[in-house]
């Protein structure tokens, strides 16, 4: 009986090819920039108990994770509701519920922003290239940040911001105080006080470029006004201006 035996040299070439392909895949995987979740301090303040550090695997779970306490909500019909996780909060908001007390409205909106931020962070994937590897929150950031970050308190100021290129052009930042690598305070020329927090980095829109997720808290030094906002920013070179991929 004749056996169809593959020549040894052909078999060796196949083995070498397979090993080369495997090594190439490993090299490509190792070169990918994995998402970074940087909001551990905010998480510790948000939940009444210790939870796992943020990761790709558990980010989406935060929608249903119990906070350890309840928020009281109400809607126009005087119907009341208690919520204790992000998923229930979003559902209640979509059906007309808001803060039960007027003075709690700012906190209610801040909770919505934080929950939405976690949902957006869950969309991040590994990136192939980064133009924010050396990014820092410092006094130069307003010169590169988009005008969408402007402290908007009226329709007029919103329209004006749309005609400008950078955040600094809109708000004329006068002073910066860096709190940590992921948080800084910015003071503008009209008594506005804004806190920027970098919550995550990763590829948000599947273009292979690393993007950055931030939250911005607005307040007035001489008043009680406050608002919270979230953004995904990106840029196409180290010195390019940031553009907005998503806003909430």
Give the ranges of each region predicted by the language model.
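Bacterial N-terminal signal peptides that target proteins for export
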Residues: 2-15
